[in-house]
Structure formats: structure tokens, C-alpha cells
Amino acid sequence: MVGSAMLAECLRDPTITSVLVVGRTSVDVQDPKLREILHPDFLDFSSLAADFAGADACFFCLGVSSVGKNEADYRKVTKDITLAAAKVIVEVAPESVFVYISGMGTDSTEHGRLMWARVKGETENALLAMPFHAYAVRPGFIQAVGGVKTKTAWYAALYRATGWLYPVLRKVSPRSVIRSDELSRAMIEVARRRPAKRVLESDDLRELL
């Protein structure tokens, strides 16, 4: 869902002249400024070094639910794949901005009881220690708008069941909610402005809009 919203916003933004999408399957979108690469091995992006060279920003939107996964499998997707991409980008585009989708509740100490929070904390810390402009954004509940939909069935069911809560949460706990279009626009603003704060919650992101 986040990746689809991010792509749509990048294609809409007139200041963004070229968009490269790397995935295992096609996004099935046609646009003059879009280029797509289907890449089977997400643990090795070295063959894409020339494609990444000179990039201004990377919006890393890959994510997976921890439900039903052991820690090793979750770490492979959440941390190992992220760092595999980041290591190539930092070599060929060291002045670029890397914006990583993390999540509210991430544990920066890496020692908490929640497995997913620890692993995301490890990932954030590793990225922030790398010699480029890395940011971690921590959205909570994301309201899908503009036709954006999640591909995860139980997420979709959850959104249908709890969508009515969004206006309430927005008032009582603005830090915990954000719309998909707001998140995407804010991530673009992070890349443009390079704010001093490098870990951003939903309310921090809305302040950039």
C-alpha cells in the first residue's frame, strides 16, 4: 500500500522528472517518467549499481507483517534486504537521501520484548549509521485514500473494520495516524529538505506539508 501511494505521488509531482521502481513483479503502471526493473534477488542489488548511480532519493517501501514469522525470517525481509539496497546506493549515490518506512513503536534500543520492534530498530540504527542522508519514518495507522489498497488480505479486512476510527484517532492521537497521500508527500519533503530530525513520527511528517 505504501509503495503504491509513494509511486502515485512521485508521478504526480511535477518537480520529480524520473522515477525508477525496482520490484519482483510489475506495478502495471504506464507513465513517461517511470522506468521499471524486475529484479529477482533482493539480497543482492549489485547488478543495479549503474541504475542507482546519481539518484537523488530512494523511498524504501518494502515491508512485511511479522504475523506468523519467526525472527530470522522477519529479519531477512525487514533488515537484510533493506541494507542490501542501502549498501549499493551509498556506494554509487552517497549524496542521496534514503527514506525508510519503519513503524510507530519501533524499538531503537534493540532490546525490547516485541520482536518486530527490535528488528525495525536494528534496521533504523544500521541505516542511520551509514554515510549518507538516511531517515526513518514511523507512521502508525495509515488511512488509504485515492484508490490505494493493501495487498495483504488481513490488513485490508482490518482497514475495512476500523476505518471509522480514523477521524477519532486523528483528533485524540494525531501522532498515531496519517493518510497515505500525506505520508507520501511528506516523504518527498524529507528528501527535499533533509531535516535535522532523522526519525519522524506521523505528526512530524504532517508538519512538513
Task: Describe every region a protein language model picked out.
Residues R24, G103, P139-I142:
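Active-site loop/turn elements of alpha/beta-hydrolase fold enzymes
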Residues R12-T15, P32, S108-L209:
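Oxidoreductase cofactor-interface core, primarily capturing Rossmann-like NAD(P)-dependent enzymes
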Residues V64, A72, K76-A117, G121-E122, ...:
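Conserved Rossmann-fold NAD(P)-dependent oxidoreductase catalytic core, especially the SDR/UDP-sugar
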Residues M6, L38, A72, S173, ...:
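Short, flexible active-site loop motifs that bind/organize anionic cofactors or intermediates
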Residues L7, L11, I16-V21, I81, ...:
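Conserved short hydrophobic patches within well-ordered secondary structure
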Residues M1-V64, L183:
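N-terminal Rossmann/SDR dinucleotide-binding element
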Residues A5, E9-D13, A84, V88, ...:
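Rossmann-fold NAD(P)-dependent oxidoreductase module
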Residues R35-A84, V88-V90, D107, A191:
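NAD(P)H-binding glycine-rich loop region in Rossmannoid oxidoreductase-like domains
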